[in-house]
Amino acid sequence: MSMPFGYVSPEQQMRDKADYARKGIARGRSVVVLQYEHGILFVAPNPSRALHKISEIYDRIGFAAVGRYNEFEALRLGGIRYADINGYNYARDDVTARGLANLYAQNLGQIFTESMKPFEVEIVVAEVGDSSDEDHIYRLTFDGSVFDETGLVAMGGQAEAVAGRLKERYRDGLPLAEALEAALFALTEPGGERSPASQLEVAVLDRNRPHRKFLRLAGPRLERLLAEGSATSATSATPGEAEAPATAPEGDVDTGSNG
């Protein structure tokens, strides 16, 4: 039996949608999310002061995204409504990053399967716990796939390269300034210039803050952290002991000449 003219198999449709979404996401600049000494850090190059890639969802939960702003903004607002309703009807502690990740996975999966155009987004939902072992970082892709990340995650354009550079500097329990320095090192291409503080969007989920854990870092506070992280990086790059200068060997030197 011959296929009708213009027929596209479901498998090919899914591949085409996935390629389309990946290309759209890759055009955006990367965002990194990583654990630090007292919580979870979010860092994104973002020259816009009005359009945020990083936001608060609920008391202990943060949100970061790359891709089309109008699409991930719709997801963010939907997540806030979900959190507010569940926190009001039940208890605030019942609102979790896992629940939000499941909600987003269902929405993204349905859109990817049923719509002609998939969402060109990749998002992270993170929740800070009472200790680092209780922190949760979930990454969701355009088709609704969910990944439970540990320690760090990079998404957006050149995500693999950014994640590789971040792993070079990352370790458990980094102080905030050093974690920020590691994030900026990862987000800066080799030989490239770092984004100035005015073009960075930085926020934390700080487990030591009462009630709402989300805090944006900007202005003088961000400048101080950047200076501290840069100074720490320069100090660690300096060898602890200077190498001893080369000295001539003791005794007579054979020059290769006779006499």
Swiss-Prot record:
Pathway: Protein degradation; proteasomal Pup-dependent pathway
Compositionally biased intervals (Low complexity): 227-250
Highest taxon listed in the record's lineage: Bacteria
GO molecular function: threonine-type endopeptidase activity
Key words, A-Z: Cytoplasm, Proteasome
Cellular component terms per the entry's GO annotation: cytoplasm; proteasome core complex, alpha-subunit complex
Gene Ontology BP term (one): modification-dependent protein catabolic process
Subcellular location: Cytoplasm
Family statement: Belongs to the peptidase T1A family.
Record text on subunit structure and interactions: The 20S proteasome core is composed of 14 alpha and 14 beta subunits that assemble into four stacked heptameric rings, resulting in a barrel-shaped structure. The two inner rings, each composed of seven catalytic beta subunits, are sandwiched by two outer rings, each composed of seven alpha subunits. The catalytic chamber with the active sites is on the inside of the barrel. Has a gated structure, the ends of the cylinder being occluded by the N-termini of the alpha-subunits. Is capped by the proteasome-associated ATPase, ARC.
Summary of the function given for this chain in its UniProt record: Component of the proteasome core, a large protease complex with broad specificity involved in protein degradation.
Protein name: Proteasome subunit alpha
Upper taxonomic lineage: Bacteria, Bacillati, Actinomycetota, Actinomycetes, Streptosporangiales
Gene this chain is encoded by: prcA
